[in-house]
Amino acid sequence: MEKVGFLGACDKNSLLMYVAKALTAMQKKVLVVDSTIEQKTRYILPAINPTKSYLIEFDKIDFSVGFHNLEDICEYLGVKDKSFSQINEAANEGILKQVQSNNMVENLPYDFVLINVDSPEGIEDFGIEDAYRNYFVTTFDMYSLKKGIDILFGIQNPLKVTKVLYNFDMKNENEEYLDYLSVDCKTIWNDTSVYLPRTVEDEEVIEENQRVFKIRIKKLSAEYQEGIMYIAQDILNEGSISKIRKSIKE
């Protein structure tokens, strides 16, 4: 099981759904965790008698809402620490609990867990600094930028992060401004950024998908699809974008 963090203040729900869809097309089992304050997943995906925290399966993807950490999800799913009996009972109690917690999380029945985080607390609660990959997703309105930077200040140790940037015209000065705002953060930006269009046409497709309860990538613009497939390929760390593209169309 590999954790993948998606950090930022802008709406990332649809992006995570599409990335998860691309990963499942490659025969991977995926859990999408909505740890955000607004918990928009509650209102986007259909659920029967939803409780304060719950997990649902939708379009071959599992989605969780309302959990405070991955350990809570483990308890919800009945995942146990299979190696707990092998741990020295004389060990420090705190270390014992941490080892047990880590082992439980490792036993989650997924290839990838995509975690949507919009607060500094979420970084700590979900152990984002230990994630296999991390992405910072933002638009260039001042709220998303500055709130996003506040979230990044929750990172306590140097951490490699890939920028995922929504913008109409991809102006260089926008990305330079983000670099300026984040200069005191612990982030180490990866050399390659992902650029996603934010066109009226793409927004209409996303809204239509939500109305009909579908996760369809095909109708999105070619540029948006390429961004999704690039992220999926980066997470998979294997194969090629063309292979993912073919799997999505099947």
Q: How should each PLM-predicted stretch be described?
A:
Residues 1-25:
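Glycine-rich P-loop/Walker A and Walker A-like loops and their local beta1-loop-alpha1 context
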Residues 5-10, 31-111:
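P-loop/Walker-type NTP enzyme "switch/lid" segment
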Residues 6-8, 33-34, 113-116, 134-140, ...:
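Conserved beta-strand segments of the P-loop GTPase G domain that flank and frequently precede/overlap
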Residues 42, 143-153, 204-206:
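Short, charged, surface-exposed secondary-structure boundary motifs
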Residues 104-124:
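Glycine-rich phosphate-binding loop used to anchor ATP phosphates in small-molecule kinases
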Residues 120-141:
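Inter-motif core of Ras-like GTPase G domains
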Residues 168-222:
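Beta-strand-loop-alpha "switch" segments that mediate conformational coupling across diverse proteins
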Residues 206-250:
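NTP-binding/hydrolysis catalytic cores, primarily Walker-type P-loop NTPases
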